[in-house]
């Protein structure tokens, strides 16, 4: 009996050659719509779908393959006599191979001019149904949704006249992933359209971006996935201009770096980061000076660090960066001369280019944190804060220079691991206390790091001070200005201690824990 294939594809890459090879192997081909036209024009003889179903394509193509003559031919078990008899009794011919890919829903909704009606019309119904029927019956039917699998299928058909069970099973699994992701994307689109903030089912889909050598540690397997609807301002979308493949830890650090730099838009700014904590932030009127400040903030920790700059990297800045061992440099652009300098004898230095004009859109993306047996979902900590809403709670008001420095410190503290303390002046970080289990411990570490640069320095805390001992440590170091959320039942103790030492202290009313 002549074997039959059903081919209906929106992505026609490689399909002509595939179909010609099938014909050479003696297969009959059923086809639909535009696919049939393309195959016929290429000289590949096909059977029209309506010759199989006995019904014409109708309703603008919405109904063409949803018919027992199609799904019976796909779902009939070859090892079940009752199935084969039912097919014979109803004049249903078996279909042994399905090649289908789906309407371009993703590509459609990514179009800037897309309308709701156009999106709806690009929801495929018949395609997923055929794929799922064929995949369910993979014991007998081969199903292909990806042109990358054409060669494998043709090779096995040419060698043995049929595909192996292992191949059919693998392709079926791939199809079920494919249709699930397709439906998840549609669900995500409709959830957004109706404004459902807390859906009872969370369906999101990601595409494999990079198979990784290992994860956070060599004993951990890992892979990198990108959202099916890509975020332009993300490490997944960054253009790599030089260097080795990004590692798992590289990606996490780089992601933290581009989140930090988002908050520093107004002036040229450089952020240096290690282990997801900023170890140096500098800002100035030009990017070269901003680099100088970021480097001076911690010239030891910068070794092997990640650097992100919010302005084009020029030659002068590149010359200063080049001698230092860095893992990654990220910027919106690089001058031709700067790129030549940075890549000279630095084949492993990872250099990324990222569209900073897409930052705002990235802020609305949810954050997902895996826990054993579950997933936490929250919006990002990107609340707009206005210094005019802050409250000076001490007798002394901040000076103009202190006010500027406190704003700078408050931006920086958001990205320090809790319990987080940061000491800065008005243009660079000076000391960092991160990740301690008690706040006074973080205060002491930050002061120790900044001890030679405390003149005119200010201090920020990501959460309230639970006891006045923190204020005593800060005052003893000579720091005169503090910014913190407030909110402790012992706030008054901290205020009294600050007043006793002539400090100025601001309460913002907003906490910035980072775990």
Swiss-Prot record:
GO terms for molecular function: IMP cyclohydrolase activity; phosphoribosylaminoimidazolecarboxamide formyltransferase activity. Pathway: Purine metabolism; IMP biosynthesis via de novo pathway; 5-formamido-1-(5-phospho-D-ribosyl)imidazole-4-carboxamide from 5-amino-1-(5-phospho-D-ribosyl)imidazole-4-carboxamide (10-formyl THF route): step 1/1; Purine metabolism; IMP biosynthesis via de novo pathway; IMP from 5-formamido-1-(5-phospho-D-ribosyl)imidazole-4-carboxamide: step 1/1. GO terms for biological process: 'de novo' IMP biosynthetic process. SMART domains: AICARFT_IMPCHas (SM00798), MGS (SM00851). Keywords: Hydrolase, Multifunctional enzyme, Purine biosynthesis, Transferase. GO terms for cellular component: cytosol. Residues 1-145 form the MGS-like domain. Its EC number is 2.1.2.3, 3.5.4.10. Pfam families: AICARFT_IMPCHas, MGS. InterPro entries: AICAR_Tfase_dup_dom_sf, Cytidine_deaminase-like, MGS-like_dom, MGS-like_dom_sf, PurH-like. SUPFAM superfamilies: Cytidine deaminase-like (SSF53927), Methylglyoxal synthase-like (SSF52335). It catalyses: (6R)-10-formyltetrahydrofolate + 5-amino-1-(5-phospho-beta-D-ribosyl)imidazole-4-carboxamide = 5-formamido-1-(5-phospho-D-ribosyl)imidazole-4-carboxamide + (6S)-5,6,7,8-tetrahydrofolate; IMP + H2O = 5-formamido-1-(5-phospho-D-ribosyl)imidazole-4-carboxamide. The IMP cyclohydrolase activity resides in the N-terminal region. Belongs to the PurH family. This is Bifunctional purine biosynthesis protein PurH.
């Amino acid at each position: 009996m002549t074997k039959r294939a059903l081919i209906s594809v929106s992505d026609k890459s490689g399909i002509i050659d595939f179909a010609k090879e099938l014909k050479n192997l003696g297969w009959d081909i059923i086809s639909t719509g535009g696919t049939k036209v393309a195959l016929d024009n290429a000289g590949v003889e096909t059977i029209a779908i309506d010759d199989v179903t006995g019904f014409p394509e109708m309703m603008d193509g919405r109904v063409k393959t949803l018919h027992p003559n199609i799904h019976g031919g796909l779902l009939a078990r070859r090892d079940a006599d009752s199935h084969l008899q039912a097919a014979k009794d109803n004049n249903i011919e078996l279909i042994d191979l399905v090649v289908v890919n789906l309407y371009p829903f993703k590509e459609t909704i990514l179009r800037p001019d897309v309308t709701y009606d156009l999106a709806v019309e690009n929801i495929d119904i018949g395609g997923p149904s055929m794929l799922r029927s064929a995949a369910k019956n993979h014991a007998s039917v081969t199903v292909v949704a990806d042109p990358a699998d054409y060669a494998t299928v043709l090779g096995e058909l040419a060698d043995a006249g049929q595909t192996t069970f292992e191949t059919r099973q693998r392709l079926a699994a791939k199809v079920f992933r494919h249709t699930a992701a397709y439906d998840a994307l549609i669900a995500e689109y409709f959830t957004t359209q109706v404004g459902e903030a807390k859906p009872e089912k969370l369906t999101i889909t990601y595409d494999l971006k990079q198979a990784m050598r290992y994860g956070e540690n060599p004993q951990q397997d890992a892979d990198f996935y990108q959202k099916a609807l890509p975020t332009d301002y993300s490490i997944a979308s960054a253009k790599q201009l030089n260097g080795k493949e990004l590692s798992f830890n590289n990606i996490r650090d780089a992601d933290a770096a581009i989140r930090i730099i988002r908050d520093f838009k107004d002036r040229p700014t450089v952020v240096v980061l290690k282990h997801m904590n900023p170890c140096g932030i500098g800002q100035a009127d030009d990017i070269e000076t901003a680099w100088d400040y970021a480097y001076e903030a911690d010239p030891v920790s910068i070794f092997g660090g990640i650097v992100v700059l919010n302005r084009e990297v020029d030659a002068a800045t590149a010359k200063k960066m080049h001698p230092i061992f860095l893992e990654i440099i990220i910027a919106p652009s690089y001058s031709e001369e700067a790129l030549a300098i940075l890549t000279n004898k630095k084949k492993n230095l990872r250099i990324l280019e990222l569209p900073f004009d897409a930052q705002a859109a990235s802020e609305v993306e949810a954050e997902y944190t895996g826990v054993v047996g579950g997933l936490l979902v929250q919006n990002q900590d990107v609340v707009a804060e206005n210094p005019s809403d802050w409250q000076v709670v001490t007798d002394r008001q901040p000076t103009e220079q202190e006010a500027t420095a406190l704003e700078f410190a408050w931006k920086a503290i958001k990205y320090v691991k809790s319990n987080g303390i940061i000491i800065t002046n008005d243009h660079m970080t000076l000391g960092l206390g991160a990740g301690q289990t008690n706040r006074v411990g973080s205060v002491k570490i930050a002061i120790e790091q900044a001890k030679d640069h405390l003149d005119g320095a200010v201090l920020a805390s990501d959460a309230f001070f639970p006891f006045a001992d923190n204020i005593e440590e800060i005052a003893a170091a000579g720091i005169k200005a503090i910014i913190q959320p407030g909110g402790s039942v012992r706030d008054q103790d901290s205020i009294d201690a600050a007043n006793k030492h002539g400090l100025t202290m601001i309460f913002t009313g907003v906490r910035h824990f980072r775990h």
